[in-house]
A protein has these predicted regions:
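Extended acidic/charged loop-beta regions that coordinate divalent cations
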Residues: 1-85
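Short glycine-rich loop/turn motifs that provide flexible caps or phosphate-binding loops at active sites
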Residues: 9, 91, 202-203
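Residue-level detector of alpha-helix boundaries and kinks
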Residues: 15-18, 40, 87, 139, ...
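A short local loop/turn or secondary-structure capping micro-motif enriched for an aromatic residue
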Residues: 16, 95-97, 149-150
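Short, structured coil/loop segments at alpha-helix boundaries
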Residues: 22, 39, 89-94, 250
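ATP-dependent carboxylate-amine ligase
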Residues: 25-27, 31-34, 44-57, 104-113, ...
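Long, charge-rich boundary regions
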Residues: 56-134
Length: 272
């Protein structure tokens, strides 16, 4: 390895006795002895405060850490890093990790917390990453999904919404999406049965596959509509009963849906 200075960052909130990660978690084999890592703190996937109880391999001491999660909503987060309060205008635990990485770099270059806070205050959701717009009178949020961990975190984020909403899941299988869509079976779509979602649209090239995945969760099959054409998904959203809608979309489906929104003059085609 290069002899460069290293900044370790992560979460250092409430700990438990070491326990195994979720059975479907990848990347939990110890790189030293090939034992199974356990976690005193497991934020999601294989991230957190890990240790191998066979050989002692463990997470290095953190340089920059989230030491308190003050508030987590579907549209924003409040948290403390190294004792300083921060706020970001975007939802989801995964975005706190993004903010934490930025703070770690800023910390290394001696950027003050006040400057970091001003930067966070100016940040906003962009280009399919919790991008908001209206379809008719519906408040809509577009969220990119592209792998099991990211999809599960997006589902965790929308689960925080304090209101009912319609849901659209758009699945394409172009090269930019990944032509193997079996990853949808590793994403925790089962959580949708715990949300107030009166109706779901399954759309995109692989609409039948995502519709099947959603039916397997136990969500009522008669409340799932399939549409290969995104124009039909758009029309469906416009006519749905809830004032809020979430659209989870793989990469090329997100691009196609944004193109449709731009043609309807609901968003700018290119975001600054």
């Amino acid at each position: 390895p290069l002899p460069n200075p290293v900044q370790y960052f992560g979460f250092d909130t409430e700990k438990t006795a070491p326990q195994l990660a979720h059975y479907n978690t990848e990347g939990i084999v110890c790189p030293e002895c090939h034992g199974i890592l356990t976690y005193q703190l497991n934020t999601y996937a294989n991230l957190g405060d890990y240790i191998c109880e066979s050989c002692g391999f463990h997470r290095p001491p953190l340089t920059v850490a989230v030491d308190e999660l003050t508030e987590l909503t579907n549209t924003s987060s409040h948290f403390k890093i190294n004792g300083t309060n921060y706020h970001i205008n975007i939802g989801g635990l995964y975005n706190i990790y993004n903010a934490l990485a930025a703070v770690a770099v800023a910390h290394y270059f001696d950027v003050s917390p006040d400057v970091i806070k001003r930067g966070f205050d100016k940040s906003k959701a962009v280009f399919g990453r919790q991008e908001t717009f209206k379809i008719g009178d519906k408040e809509c949020t577009l969220v990119l999904i592209k792998n099991p961990v990211g999809a599960t975190q997006a589902i965790e984020m929308i689960k925080l919404a304090p209101y009912p909403f319609s849901l659209s899941v758009l699945l394409n299988a172009n090269y930019a999406d990944g032509i193997d869509t079996s990853w949808i079976w590793d994403a925790d779509f089962e959580q949708i049965t715990q949300m107030d979602i009166p109706e779901i649209n399954a759309g995109g090239v692989r609409h039948s596959e995502i519709a099947r995945r959603l039916r397997v969760t136990g969500y009522p099959a008669d409340q799932i509509t399939e549409n290969a054409k995104l124009e039909d998904v758009f029309t469906q959203i416009k006519g749905q009963t809830t004032p809020h809608a979430y659209i989870l979309a793989t990469y090329t489906a997100m691009l196609e849906f944004r193109e449709l929104l731009a043609q309807e003059h609901l968003i700018e085609k290119e975001m600054n």
